[in-house]
């Protein structure tokens, strides 16, 4: 009886060992990579950056290294890579959102909603240009980014630039109108006021007090 029990126990140990080894063999390969959260980056590009090849044993996928390699792309703000057993790897990407850009001698610098200059590249269509003498001042730049980020999608396409001043900001529209924004505060209400004035006649508007909009 003891010999039989010992034999059963040994068999269980062997089976457990085989089961533990399976993920590291070609029996359980990666059959697909699922990429989510990417907009600017092409899915194929993310797959290439991960370095994960279809057919790689699931247990041999180095998810930490894959995440580090994807994070090396300037568009990537953060990334998570995890195994989705039995045969897939999930790559969840959070990209920088280019809300604004600055034209410099070396090219167009994209600025995200945190004020980070993260890439020199062609700006997206919905990014707003930042101009003016104070654009190099970090505090003024943060204020300008906050203004640009608050502009609604419906208004954004009509805004050509935000002029960065020391304490005040002005918006220029694509058709040459001016909107005085004032200080970078109460931006949510000013953005709502902006939606209204863009539908009005006039060449110059002031939304620095969003509850008392003026025009001329």
Regions found by a protein language model. Give the residues of each.
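Extracytoplasmic/secreted envelope proteins and their assembly/folding machinery
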Residues: 43, 47, 63, 67, ...
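Extracytoplasmic
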Residues: 28-30, 41, 73-74, 84-88, ...
């Amino acid at each position: 009886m003891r010999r039989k029990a010992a034999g059963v126990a040994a068999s269980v140990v062997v089976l457990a060992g085989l089961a533990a080894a399976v993920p590291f063999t070609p029996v359980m390969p990666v059959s697909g990579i699922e990429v989510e959260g990417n907009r600017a980056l092409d899915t194929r590009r993310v797959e290439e950056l991960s370095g994960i090849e279809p057919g790689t044993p699931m247990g041999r996928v180095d998810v930490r290294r894959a995440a580090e390699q994807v994070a090396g792309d300037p568009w990537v703000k953060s990334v998570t890579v995890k195994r989705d057993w039995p045969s897939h790897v999930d790559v969840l990407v959070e990209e920088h959102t280019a809300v604004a850009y600055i034209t410099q001698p070396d090219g167009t610098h994209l600025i995200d909603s945190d004020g980070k200059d993260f890439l020199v590249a062609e700006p997206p269509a919905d990014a707003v240009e930042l101009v003016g003498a104070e654009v190099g001042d970090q505090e003024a730049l943060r204020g300008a980014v906050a203004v640009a980020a608050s502009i609604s999608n419906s208004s954004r396409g009509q805004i050509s630039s935000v002029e960065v001043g020391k304490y005040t900001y002005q918006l220029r529209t694509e058709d040459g109108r001016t909107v005085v924004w004032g200080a970078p505060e109460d931006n949510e209400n000013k953005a709502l006021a902006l939606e209204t004035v863009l539908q009005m006649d006039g060449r110059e508007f002031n939304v620095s007090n969003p509850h008392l909009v003026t025009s001329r």
